[in-house]
């Protein structure tokens, strides 16, 4: 910082600084000195400049190469992800189709099972009805037989008196004698 301040202070004492312009005289401009300085800069600075440019070029090329590699890797990963996505879509479609067919199959099985249960219940109901009909018929037969027997006994008791009783006995005795005489 002190150097810069000193330079500014001392520059005020320079007489050239006050008169700045373009000098067109070649001999006064010292073109040869400038050419020598530029030539030396080119000759000695060429290696350094070439090294700097070469290093910069290598850095840029390696950066481009890395970017291309990352791009290729990203492209590969994207393609792999797309393939996985397609496989997942196919798998999802298969699962959906299998699910729908499974639902249809289970629906048919449930309908068949319900039909079988309904048929079994209908058969059981019909068997129960037939059994109850048979039981009712049997009860009616027994009741009719009992009533017929009671009426027959009542009728016999009303008609059967001692005279009829004697005649029936005599008749049967006569039949037994007739059978006995034919068998001799």
Swiss-Prot record:
Primary localization class, coarse: plastid
Keyword annotations of the record: ATP synthesis, CF(0), Chloroplast, Hydrogen ion transport, Ion transport, Membrane, Plastid, Thylakoid, Transmembrane, Transmembrane helix, Transport
Pfam families tied to this protein: ATP-synt_B
CDD domains: ATP-synt_Fo_b (cd06503)
Membrane topology: Single-pass membrane protein
Subcellular location, record wording: Plastid, Chloroplast thylakoid membrane
Domain of life: Eukaryota
Signal peptide (from-to): none
GO cellular component: chloroplast thylakoid membrane; proton-transporting ATP synthase complex
Transmembrane segments: 4-24
GO MF terms held by the record: proton-transporting ATP synthase activity, rotational mechanism
Family of the protein in this entry: Belongs to the ATPase B chain family.
Known function: F(1)F(0) ATP synthase produces ATP from ADP in the presence of a proton or sodium gradient. F-type ATPases consist of two structural domains, F(1) containing the extramembraneous catalytic core and F(0) containing the membrane proton channel, linked together by a central stalk and a peripheral stalk. During catalysis, ATP synthesis in the catalytic domain of F(1) is coupled via a rotary mechanism of the central stalk subunits to proton translocation. Component of the F(0) channel, it forms part of the peripheral stalk, linking F(1) to F(0).
Binding partners and assembly: F-type ATPases have 2 components, F(1) - the catalytic core - and F(0) - the membrane proton channel. F(1) has five subunits: alpha(3), beta(3), gamma(1), delta(1), epsilon(1). F(0) has four main subunits: a(1), b(1), b'(1) and c(10-14). The alpha and beta chains form an alternating ring which encloses part of the gamma chain. F(1) is attached to F(0) by a central stalk formed by the gamma and epsilon chains, while a peripheral stalk is formed by the delta, b and b' chains.
Further comment found in the protein's record: In plastids the F-type ATPase is also known as CF(1)CF(0).
Record-linked PANTHER family: ATP SYNTHASE SUBUNIT B, CHLOROPLASTIC
Protein name: ATP synthase subunit b, chloroplastic
Organism: Physcomitrium patens
